[in-house]
Amino acid sequence: MVCPSPLRECHPFLQRSFFPSFALSHRDIISTRACLNDNSPAFDRRYHWVWEEDRRCLNLGKTLASTIHHKGGNLSLQWQRGNTTTHIATRWDANKLLLARAILKEKRNILQDKTSVNVNVNKLIPIPKKKVLKNRAKSLLSIKSHVHFHLIPFINFFLLYHQIILSHSLFHISHLISFHFLFFSFLSFPLLSFILFPCFSLFLSSNSFSLASPFSS
């Protein structure tokens, strides 16, 4: 079947599933008509393949799948673009049941395609932009935890060192022991810094535990 010149670009849904020779755009109108074996019309409906920024209308696959149970019936499809009309007639048989499964599977694949335009058909899946924002939030949380567990211990190290200098007790053996104990504790358990650092500051500034400054007269 030769593809008319206005219908050269093929949509992946049609290319992999049904008619690889035809394509659709926002200007295409799809007409379907299915008849039973006795030629009584099962339905005669007209569908528009709608292209918008955030949704795709997949009524074509839905229509084709709904006609599969008429295994012996006839299905006619009609593409209409302006004054150009293309008719397709086919006869369903038992093998077309496999085609129905392929259509439904392809429809799910399109809905789950993260690289395609945002799809919103009956709100079956969330908009992919929300997933991107969620992943960005997770990355920010991981950066925050990384900074917390690796940067805070060293900040506390310099704060404690500065506090020892100010208290003029750098050479006091008890302060050195406490200082090293707290420092290595902070490296292993950063959350302890918020509890032990104020206590250690009070310990250094206490008059009962501080010695006279070696620099005082």
UniProtKB/Swiss-Prot annotation:
Its main location: mitochondrion. The chain crosses the membrane at residues 151-171, 177-197. One of its GO terms (cellular component) is mitochondrial membrane. It is a multi-pass membrane protein. It is found in: Mitochondrion membrane. Keywords: Membrane, Mitochondrion, Transit peptide, Transmembrane, Transmembrane helix. This is Uncharacterized protein C17A2.11, mitochondrial. The lineage of its organism: Eukaryota, Fungi, Dikarya, Ascomycota, Taphrinomycotina.
